[in-house]
Regions:
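Beta-loop-alpha module in the N-terminal Rossmann-like domain of NAD(P)-dependent dehydrogenases
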Residues: 60-120
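Short, well-ordered coil/turn segments that N-cap beta-strands
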Residues: 37, 76, 99, 126-127
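A general structural signal for well-ordered alpha-helical segments in protein cores
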Residues: 28, 50, 87, 91, ...
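Hydrophobic residues in well-ordered beta-strands that form the structural core
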Residues: 23, 63, 103, 128-130
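N-terminal Rossmann-like dinucleotide-binding module
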Residues: 1-57
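Alpha-helical structural signal in soluble globular domains
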Residues: 30-34, 53-57, 92-97, 116-120, ...
Length: 148
């Protein structure tokens, strides 16, 4: 990832695609609260809800179109928080723009989509992450322990 950042700038400048309920209460605030992480823009179909999100979270830019946020040169990483049926298409657009991508679970709708995303990001040596945050929650750790 370091090679994808601008020289003398180790800040990840995020664009969020799909700033809805999942983003609002789970992952979203971390993108601007963590050190060396800055939330530059969000993309949401509803202009009113998108601009409201920006105002409440002090996000400088709003887009209603995926292609527009991906063309923002200030952004150097993308978080996809849209319905799973859109993950593959949006991930491929991020890949085409050489943007490291963090995708809300599940990565794809099925094995074929998931494998396609993983393999194409690997081929380009581009960082790809999936938001499997629940695996660190106590009830899931307990279930894992029981299974093992």
């Amino acid at each position: 990832m370091a090679s994808l950042l601008k020289e003398n700038d180790d800040t990840v400048r995020w664009g969020i695609i799909g700033a809805g309920a999942v983003c609002e209460v789970k992952s979203g605030p971390a993108f601007y609260k963590c050190d060396k992480s800055k939330l530059i823009a969000i993309c949401r179909r509803s202009e009113q809800e998108g601009k409201d999100f920006c105002a409440r979270h002090n996000v400088p830019k709003y887009y209603s179109n995926v292609d527009d946020i991906l063309n923002d040169n200030e952004i150097n990483a993308i978080y996809i928080s849209t319905p799973p049926s859109t993950h593959h298409e949006i991930a491929m657009k991020c890949l085409a723009k050489n943007l490291p991508t963090y995708v809300e679970k599940p990565l794809g709708r099925n094995y074929t989509e998931t494998l396609d995303i993983v393999n194409k990001f690997k081929q380009k040596k581009l960082p790809l992450f999936v938001a499997y945050y629940r695996r660190s929650q106590s009830k899931f750790l307990h279930a894992k322990k029981l299974i093992e």
